[in-house]
Amino acid sequence: MSLNNLSNSYNQYLAQESHQILRHLFLNKQYSPLVKRDDDSSATVTCGGDANEFNEYGHLGYRIGAIFVILATSLIGMNLPLVLSKITKNRPNVYIEYLYLFARYFGSGVILATAFIHLLAPACNKLYDPCLDDLFGGYDWAPGICLISCWFILLLEVLLNRYVEWRFGMEIGDHHGPTLGAKQHSHSHEDGAHGVHEHPVYDIEECADGVEHECVKDDLEEVKLEPYTNTDSTDLTTKEEARSFLLKQQLTAFIILESSIILHSVIIGLTTAVSGEEFKTLFPVIIFHQAFEGCGLGSRLAGMAWGPKTAWVPWVLGVIYSLVTPIGMAAGLGVREHWDPLAHGSYAAQGVLDAISSGILVYAGLVELLAHDFLFSPERERNWYKLIYLLACSMAGTGVMALLGKWA
């Protein structure tokens, strides 16, 4: 064997061994919670656990009280951006304005970190477990499911946008499409039948009482809509029609985002309720987790084009988010004597659901939130000092949520 062939074979061997070592270290595969060992060096004996062993520490009273604490925390986190938005609209204040911006962009960073640290990494740990090799062995299913989930959400949004275009006869994405925060202007073009005519631009930000006023520019992402043209070249000239169209687009993206977080919150509630001694550490972490995620969702609701007839919707959506984790905890307490979180079925289901949710939040966090806010929005911040502040808020949200991943 030549020296070159020997060197290539050795390099391939090192690459394979390095991959296996890193895979084991990152995924903690050798310390699988599903695998019981007699000592550190012994082979696998039994997979799964005893449902009763996860509840031997008691603290039932604290667990019941935790349901109401997390409910209150979720409500505060979700509704704080909505309240700040209303206050700033009615009485502009630079401090409240910056507090609102902090909640909005900090929440965006939280959602992105949740996708990678709190969903994708646990999904890898679960689906790579040795006890699940019969189901998921031979392929990296966790990132694969995450990738499929990203593509599914993209295709879903494309189809929904096409449906809106077909249903309302509107072209999306051209110069007549919705423009968020565009400068007020008008333009003219030749029409064979009607000659030259202009399209006005409508400011659709309104106060809670429905009376128009001058809202804080840029900071509340004041929405200005240019009328749309349909296939018959008939202009949509009413503000209510323009608002309705924009709201449908925004609400579609938000429902996709909230559905993933709700799915994740149910799992959080179940696992928190049936946790053992680690409940003391897990509980305060979940409080921060729910508050930060609530700020991220609430800030998105506050920036949407709600009209007088739909002003109640964001508050209802906020209540739905706030109830999900407490309901999951209550369900976990109800089945704690019989549910084994380390059983093959429940462990695999948690891994698959975490991977699906991570894909949705990766897409939503990068495309719908950060890319829209910093790259694609016509109203993106052009003031360098404020831009640095907004970027710092987003990175702080990501960092804090990633740090919390050490405990939950």
Swiss-Prot record:
One GO CC term, this protein: plasma membrane
Source domain of life: Eukaryota
Transmembrane regions listed in the UniProt entry: 64-84, 101-121, 141-161, 254-274, 279-299, 315-335, 351-371, 387-407
Locations listed in the record: Endoplasmic reticulum membrane
Any GO BP annotation: intracellular zinc ion homeostasis
Bilayer topology term: Multi-pass membrane protein
Keyword Endoplasmic reticulum: yes
Signal sequence interval, chain numbering: none
Family, similarity comment: Belongs to the ZIP transporter (TC 2.A.5) family.
NCBIfam families referenced in this protein's UniProt entry, alphabetically: zip (TIGR00820)
Protein name: Zinc-regulated transporter 1
Organism: Schizosaccharomyces pombe (strain 972 / ATCC 24843)
